[in-house]
Amino acid sequence: MNISRPEQRTLHVLAKGGYIVRIRDDAGRITTVECHTREGHILSDCTLAVFQKLKAKRLVSSKNSQPYRINRNGLLAVRAQLDNQ
């Protein structure tokens, strides 16, 4: 599966315990999304277009109206990255 660099970064943050929050307008449409890391920072690479691509590829999912998290397919699609921790 072809995954772009911003999608890969977002999946990596989600695999480490992050989540995606949708922000809606008054009409109920999703206007922006925020990808939060497990440390509480916000990832700037996660845009509405990236979120829609990940959702269309079924790499992220939401259960019971909770924030979006990575699912099994997303974990299999993400490539390993080295971290300085």
From Swiss-Prot:
Database matches in InterPro entries: YjhX_toxin
Position of the signal peptide: none
Domain of life: Bacteria
Family per record: Belongs to the UPF0386 family.
Name of the molecule in the record: UPF0386 protein LHK_03186
Species annotation: Laribacter hongkongensis (strain HLHK9)
Upper classification of the organism: Bacteria, Pseudomonadati, Pseudomonadota, Betaproteobacteria, Neisseriales
